[in-house]
Amino acid sequence: LLNAEDIKKAVGACAAAESFDHKKFFQMVGLKKKNREEVKMVFQILDKDKSGFIEEEELKFILKGFSADARDLSDTETKRMMAAGDKDGDGKIGA
């Protein structure tokens, strides 16, 4: 679904603390070029508890969904991404 080399580069680009930019990351892994169904498939992989949503606790570990040896997001990075993705303010990101 996503190119392994693109994922490796994207994870490497945000290896430093506080360097994660969700827009840049998703562009680098190729999600911006995927259709809605393909994006939904990736979302389902990242939705670890299969609730249909990505909650803040899952979001903290989102990079590990792409690469097992990736770092966790900081609280600041997690909150920034949640604010960008949580369109209705319920503390979750839907597909």
Swiss-Prot record:
Positions bearing Phosphoserine: 19
InterPro entries assigned to the protein according to its UniProt record, in alphabetical order: EF-hand-dom_pair (IPR011992), EF_Hand_1_Ca_BS (IPR018247), EF_hand_dom (IPR002048), Parvalbumin (IPR008080)
Residues annotated to bind Ca(2+) 1: 47, 49, 51, 53, 55, 58
Residues that coordinate or bind Ca(2+) 2: 86, 88, 90, 92
Entry GO MF terms: calcium ion binding
Keywords, alphabetical: Calcium, Metal-binding, Muscle protein, Phosphoprotein, Repeat
Pfam families the UniProt entry points to: EF-hand_7
PROSITE patterns reported for this sequence: EF_HAND_1, EF_HAND_2
Tagged with keyword Calcium: yes
Organism domain of life: Eukaryota
Gene3D superfamilies referenced in this protein's UniProt entry, alphabetically: EF-hand
Keyword field contains Transmembrane: no
Description of its domains: AB domain, comprising of helices A and B, is involved in structural stabilization, protecting the hydrophobic core of the protein. It is required for high-affinity binding of Ca(2+) and for Mg(2+)-binding.
Protein family: Belongs to the parvalbumin family.
Protein name (record): Parvalbumin alpha
Record gene name: PVALB
